[in-house]
Amino acid sequence: KRGEQPVTNKRANINKNILRVQKLHARLANIRLAYVKSIVNDVVKTKPTFITVEDLNVKGMMKNKHLSKAVAQQCFYAFKTWLSTKCREYGIELRQVDRFYPSSKICSCCGQKKSDLKLSDRVYTCECGNVMDRDLNASINLLQAKKYTILT
């Protein structure tokens, strides 16, 4: 008849779009996992005697509604398991520092603890004259950490 539109199966189109979105999410997950594997391989191939990681409170970070999606996408568990597997394979000691170790708050030069450091402060400045990036200071402190547990 004239004027009538052809009958389409709307559910089939919805299912196609759902499948497209699922494939995109799977592709993103594969990209993240490949990135984790490449970073771990780059670190392990430098053949250090040990690697020190922090025991992060991921469960607590997931409670923050602003950060939870970003934290969930970081694949912390996959990073840690891949790192421990590669460390075992290459004979590298994997150390884990307690989550309450103040790695970013201690000066890597003089050892003085700065208690008023906020997360928004990206540059660490100490009274001894040490000025450096906060993450670099934390990594040096993790390198010099005395209390740790050996994972591999």
Residue ranges and their predicted role:
Residues K1-T152:
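Positively charged, helix-rich recognition surfaces that bind polyanionic ligands
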